[in-house]
Amino acid sequence: MSNIKSPIPGIFYRRPSPEEDPFVEVGSNVNPDTVIGLVEVMKSFHKVLAEVSGKVKSIEVEDEGMVRAGDILMEVEP
């Protein structure tokens, strides 16, 4: 099991905009280049990459939830 962690503190967004579908859902397959969400810091949005390959087992943060650097965002199983 691998954890995808927030690289920076801020607000985590699971979707690119309120009208669009989430980047990934539980059960989605990801690879290291897959964007799994965005973290907003001071009006700047930073992509969060999976950095691992596998299937999303759980999503630990709600859309628009506050995160700190190192917080677990998702769990991925190989």
What are these regions (language model features)?
Residues 1-18, 38-51, 78:
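Short beta-strand-turn/beta-hairpin segments enriched in glycine/proline and small hydrophobics
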Residues 25-47, 68-78:
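Short hydrophobic beta/alpha edge segments that flank linear recognition/processing sites
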Residues 54, 61-73:
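PDZ-domain C-terminal substructure recognizer with occasional recognition of PDZ-binding tails
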Residues 14-29, 58-62:
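Short histidine-centered loop motifs in beta-beta connectors
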